[in-house]
A protein has these predicted regions:
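Hydrophobic residue at the +6 position relative to the catalytic HRD Asp in the kinase catalytic loop
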Residues: 308-312
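Active-site flanking residues adjacent to catalytic metal/cofactor-binding acidic residues
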Residues: 176, 303, 321
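An alpha-helical support segment within catalytic cores of ATP-dependent transferases
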Residues: 39-43, 134-155, 191, 249-303, ...
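Active-site activation/catalytic loop segments of kinase-like enzymes and analogous catalytic loops
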Residues: 334-359, 368-382
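Active-site Asp-x-Gly
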Residues: 298-300, 313-351
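Phosphate/pyrophosphate-binding loops and the adjoining catalytic core of nucleotide-dependent enzymes
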Residues: 2-192, 197-199, 203-204, 208-210, ...
Length: 382
């Protein structure tokens, strides 16, 4: 049997051997040829044969004082099951603090590794139900939306964190957001609150194992509009207005995460994967250190406001997604993502849209320290 990649080498073609050698041991294991061992063991326990695998998504956190690094990697794999059927499967391995309490754990070359197969995510017990058509139909009927046949499409999956499943049927179209069970009730309340004030998906209800049933809004993502054929787009003032619609009650909630104060951490994340960029990252941090943030009021903020979270239709903003992190904060700190590389002009773009693409910073007059934070946040997500 041949399992790819066949040797201890980077499984990511764009990474040099020099960079790979500087990686933390867990990152080397999960993105190198040795990853085949734990993955093969997982599949064999389910009476399958691992034919090939390839890393598809990586989240790495560098070592912190008093602890080691942690990494979680999602793989696409080809598996031959009993009877000779070959299927595409999603497999996940995690190290350090990213290992779920209920995950199977193996020792991979001296590194403790948690491992599981989609949809049996130990931190998302509702996921298996959310991808079962009969179970989803029964849940929708319980919520008064009618039963009947449903068609399910996976839209997103962040291992251990969340998954989004589109469900279509006689009831129309809804989205199932799968989260950790202890978070689902508060997230349901958050959606109900925000939907009363702005175009945020209404929550129809939830299951106790972490499935939230959300309204489907019209429109496509601003990210897609920016990268596709030229279309009318909302101006920067419309994006500012979207933030202004956030209800004041959110300012009483827990402070949303502060990207600016974590700039050094984001730089360490990037350098941990791309050590050759350390000098350039330090230069960016040096510029950031000399910038003045000034004093700004605590207001309601989205918490993760960037073009992928904004829906647009016919040149207007039609919705705002992923309000999990909405809370109190300083809005000047929340728009660094809008300075990310995807926002740039296209040759055929209408003149009226160019400012939005080339300088989303006009939204709140971004200055250098926010651009630095945006670059670091963007790099850490890749």
């Amino acid at each position: 049997m041949t399992v790819s990649p066949p040797r201890a080498a980077p499984a990511v073609p764009s990474v040099s051997d020099t960079a790979y050698a500087a990686w933390a041991p867990d990152l080397q294991l999960l993105l190198g040829g040795e990853a085949a061992g734990p993955l093969r063991a997982l599949i064999e326990t389910a009476s399958g044969e691992l034919l090939s695998f390839c890393p598809r998504q990586v989240n790495h956190q560098p070592a912190q004082p008093g602890g080691g690094s942690s990494t979680i990697v999602q793989y696409g794999a080809q598996v031959r099951w009993a009877g000779g059927r070959v299927a595409s499967e999603t497999l996940v391995m995690a190290t350090g603090g990213r290992i779920p309490r209920r995950a199977a754990v193996v020792d991979g070359d001296g590194v403790r590794v948690g491992i599981w197969r989609w949809p049996f995510d130990p931190d998302l017990p509702g996921l298996a139900s959310a991808v079962d058509a009969d179970t989803v139909s029964a849940l929708l009927a319980t919520l008064g939306m009618g039963g009947g046949k449903v068609r399910l499409t996976v839209r997103a999956y962040r291992p251990g964190r969340r998954a989004v499943i589109e469900a279509s049927g006689t009831h129309g179209r809804v989205f199932l957001k799968v989260v950790r069970p202890h978070r689902v009730q508060a997230l349901h309340a958050q959606h109900r609150l925000l939907a009363r004030h702005m175009a945020v998906p209404h929550s129809y209800g939830y299951s106790t194992d972490g499935i939230l049933v959300l309204q489907a809004l019209h429109g496509g993502s601003l990210r897609g509009a920016l990268s596709g054929p030229a279309v009318p787009l909302p101006g920067a003032s419309a994006l500012q207005g979207l933030l202004d619609q956030l209800p004041a009650e959110l300012a009483q909630n827990q402070m949303s995460g502060d990207h600016l104060s974590r700039a050094n951490h984001y730089a360490d994340v990037v350098a941990g994967c791309l050590p050759d960029e350390r000098v350039r990252l330090d230069e960016l941090l040096g510029r950031y250190a000399f910038s003045e943030a000034g004093e700004h009021p605590t207001v309601a903020v989205h918490g993760d406001f960037y073009e992928g979270q904004i829906l647009v239709e016919r040149g207007r903003v039609s919705g705002l997604l992923d309000v999990d992190t909405a809370g109190s904060g300083h809005r000047i700190e929340r728009v660094g993502d809008d300075a990310r590389p995807p926002i740039r002009p296209r040759p055929a773009a209408p003149e009226g849209n160019r400012d939005l693409r080339t300088s989303a910073g006009l939204l709140l007059r971004l200055n250098s320290y926010r651009v630095v934070a945006g670059v670091l946040v963007a790099a850490s997500r890749r």
